[in-house]
């Protein structure tokens, strides 16, 4: 999660409406607890799997850096490495994902969930008072609006962004910079 100037930029949608199905094996069919409600990659069409055994493991955690091994969160035997690295600075957060595969052609979709509606710009996306910069020529960008029933039967809307890339080599790295500019509270909701 990333909050800037009162805006939730990168978000976790929280819990959905509690129903009997929400507490059954159908739980992950609902948007809020599903992998698609979280800012995690989709690898070869496979989302992060559900269950305790499918999770990331922290490799390094310091005041300025966090590295997570995410390979075990995916049920894809061609995926040999997936590490997610966060670097924290005063005015930006840098996110690097490193992928390694058995095969040469793979599909990587960097998936993000935002509270504020993003717009495409020259260097990537503008989200409220934050710019998410990346190499736009590497990705096909798709912005979606998702409305779901949240707690107490209220409708809530978030925006998902899928940045799709067909990887033609066995290794691939992505880099996203969240450049933070605190101007004023966004009205883009």
What is each of the regions a protein language model found here?
Residues 21-189:
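CBM-like, beta-strand-rich accessory domains located in the C-terminal region of large
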Residues 1-21:
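Internal mixed beta-strand/loop scaffold within catalytic domains of large alpha/beta enzymes
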């Amino acid at each position: 999660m990333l909050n800037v100037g009162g805006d939730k930029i990168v978000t976790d949608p929280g819990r959905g409406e509690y129903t009997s199905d929400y507490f059954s094996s159908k739980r992950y069919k609902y948007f809020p607890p599903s992998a698609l409600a979280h800012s995690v990659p989709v690898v070869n069409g496979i989302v992060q799997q559900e269950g305790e055994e499918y999770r990331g493991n922290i490799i390094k955690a310091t005041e300025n850096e966090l590295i997570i091994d995410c390979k075990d969160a995916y049920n894809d035997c061609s995926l040999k490495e997936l590490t997610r690295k966060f670097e924290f600075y005063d005015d930006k957060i840098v996110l690097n994902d490193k992928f390694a595969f058995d095969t040469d052609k793979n599909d990587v979709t960097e998936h993000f969930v935002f509270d504020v509606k993003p717009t495409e710009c020259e260097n990537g996306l503008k989200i409220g008072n934050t710019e998410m910069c990346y190499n736009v020529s590497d990705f096909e960008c798709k912005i979606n609006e998702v409305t779901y029933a949240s707690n107490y039967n209220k409708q809530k809307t978030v925006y998902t962004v899928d940045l799709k890339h067909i990887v033609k080599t066995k290794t691939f790295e992505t880099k996203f910079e969240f450049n933070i500019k605190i101007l004023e509270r966004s009205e883009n909701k």
